[in-house]
Curated annotation (Swiss-Prot):
Complex and partners: PSII is composed of 1 copy each of membrane proteins PsbA, PsbB, PsbC, PsbD, PsbE, PsbF, PsbH, PsbI, PsbJ, PsbK, PsbL, PsbM, PsbT, PsbX, PsbY, PsbZ, Psb30/Ycf12, at least 3 peripheral proteins of the oxygen-evolving complex and a large number of cofactors. It forms dimeric complexes.
Protein name per the record: Photosystem II protein D1
Transmembrane segments: 28-45, 117-132, 141-155, 196-217, 273-287
Amino acids binding pheophytin a: W125
Leading EC class: oxidoreductase
Organism: Prorocentrum micans (Red tide dinoflagellate)
Binding site for chlorophyll a PD1: H197
Membrane topology: Multi-pass membrane protein
Positions bearing the site annotation: Tyrosine radical intermediate: Y160
Catalytic activity: 2 a plastoquinone + 4 hnu + 2 H2O = 2 a plastoquinol + O2
Purpose of the protein: Photosystem II (PSII) is a light-driven water:plastoquinone oxidoreductase that uses light energy to abstract electrons from H(2)O, generating O(2) and a proton gradient subsequently used for ATP formation. It consists of a core antenna complex that captures photons, and an electron transfer chain that converts photonic excitation into a charge separation. The D1/D2 (PsbA/PsbD) reaction center heterodimer binds P680, the primary electron donor of PSII as well as several subsequent electron acceptors.
Positions bound to a quinone: H214, S263, F264
Length: 343
């Protein structure tokens, strides 16, 4: 009897394991997926509930709560999950650390709950990509590419609040909250003049340009496999071994149009470049945010130009600095009267 139960139990577990690691399923689960799906479900439900229902949060720790939910007079644009209170700092603040659920909500415990579960889910997705690639015998470039947004999110939601000493400095989880975070970040750290941020911007915009160029070149040089009155697409099947476009013709065109040495005649080199450019740039952005988290800020050229009499000749850097002062004065206006860190 015991042997029969053991065999039944073993068979049941074998079926579960086979389903989890199967690469033939419509949706690959994987061992990391066992973590991923519950985590992303919990964080999504908590986020939606907080966005709709959460009471105001004492974000600055001065007993002046800020509302972020739809129930408290916000809309889709102004709504957000408000970061944890400055009174909590960088302490881990699960619900059992508060005296009551009302206190936990008042101090913004929902923010930590959503952010930490979401980041854990994103890391599980990263691991799932590696696991799936490994089981298919693929190299781990997809996993490596996705590491860029993972480290960027980690820099914004974890490293920056830790460096600043409080989760209240984290990015609010909403549309206007994101823009508010960006403006305050510029005011306090001059991110526009940080070399790593400049690299990140060139990567994102450059990557968009290169992708558009590549796509237009490919679709303009498809090899015709059909009669003139049939669709060009009818001559191809998914996964075919033959080339679908003439790379030499496409990049010969590009080389003559713009720059001879800016074109590729090797498909692998081309696609590696298209992947590496934005990934490396976003890595640089994450490094930049992480350094500014500890106040290693952007370059400062304020009042750097003087005339022969020693008077300041205002430059664009001084205009930006004046704007930064204005944004900093408006930020946390009830907490301080003037930004001493920029005075």
């Amino acid at each position: 009897m015991k042997n029969s139960q053991a065999v039944t139990s073993l068979t049941w577990w074998s079926v579960v394991v086979a389903y989890i690691v199967s690469t033939n399923s419509r949706l690959y689960i994987g061992w990391f997926g066992v973590l991923l799906f519950p985590l992303i479900a919990v964080s999504t439900v908590a986020y939606v509930a907080a966005f709709i229902l959460a009471p105001p949060v004492d974000i600055d720790g001065i007993r002046e709560p800020v509302s972020g939910s739809l129930l408290y007079s916000n809309n889709i644009i102004t709504g957000a999950v408000i970061p944890s209170s400055n009174a909590i700092g960088v302490h881990f603040y699960p619900v059992w650390e508060a005296i009551s659920n009302n206190e936990w909500l008042y101090n913004g415990g929902t923010y930590q709950f959503v952010v930490l579960h979401f980041l854990a889910a994103v890391l599980a997705w990263l691991g799932r990509e590696y696991e799936y690639s490994f089981r298919l015998g693929m190299r781990p470039w997809i996993y490596l590419a996705f590491s860029a947004p993972v480290v960027a999110a980690s820099a914004v939601f974890v490293v920056y609040p830790i460096g600043q000493g409080s989760f209240s400095d984290g990015m609010p989880l909403g549309i206007s909250g994101t823009f508010n975070f960006m403006l305050v970040f510029q005011a306090e750290h001059n991110i526009l003049m940080h070399p790593f941020h400049i690299l990140g911007v060139s990567a994102v915009f450059g990557g968009s340009l290169f992708s558009a160029m590549h796509g237009s070149l490919v679709t303009s040089s498809l090899l015709s496999e059909t009669a003139s009155y049939d669709s060009l697409n009818a001559g191809y099947v998914f996964g075919q071994e033959d080339e679908t476009y003439a790379i030499s013709a496409a990049h010969g065109y590009f080389g003559r149009l713009l720059f001879q040495y800016g074109s590729f005649n090797n498909s692998r080199s081309l696609h590696f470049f298209l992947a590496a450019w934005p990934v490396i740039g976003i890595w640089c952005t994450a490094i930049g945010v992480s350094t500014m988290a500890f106040n290693l800020n952007g370059l400062n050229f304020n009042q750097s130009l003087l005339d022969s009499s020693g008077h300041v000749v205002n430059s664009w850097a001084d205009v930006v600095n004046r704007a930064d002062l204005g944004m900093e004065v408006m930020h946390e206006r009830n907490t301080h009267n003037f930004p001493l860190d920029l005075a």
